[in-house]
A protein has these predicted regions:
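Short glycine/proline-centered loop/turn elements that form peptide/ligand docking sites
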Residues: 20, 30, 35-44
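Short secondary-structure transition/capping segments
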Residues: 29-30, 49
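Flexible loop/coil segments at beta-strand boundaries within sensory signal-transduction domains
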Residues: 25-27
Length: 81
């Protein structure tokens, strides 16, 4: 799921990234996203919204799906030439 480029960042020609940490649930959805680092606060809300739409295959231990905390990802915001 691609994030929506924030209008203020777009109008200013800003590029950047947001590093996030979150938990993957037993259903493969994302919960509790936390911003670890970002180049601009303008990107944080868009990155959190995008990561909440991510879907994962749940981790299975002994035939039972388990939550996976501490998953990390970087969402990049780059302007096209």
């Amino acid at each position: 799921v691609a994030p929506v480029y924030p209008a203020r960042a777009l109008s200013r020609g800003l590029e950047g990234f947001v590093d996030l940490s979150f938990t993957v649930t037993t259903a493969g959805t994302v919960k509790d996203p936390i911003v670890l680092q970002s180049t601009s606060s303008l990107f944080e809300r868009a990155a959190v919204r995008a990561v909440l739409k991510f879907k994962y295959k749940p981790r299975v231990v002994d035939g039972v799906p388990v939550e996976v905390p501490g998953v990390k990802t970087r969402i990049s915001f780059m302007l096209e030439d």
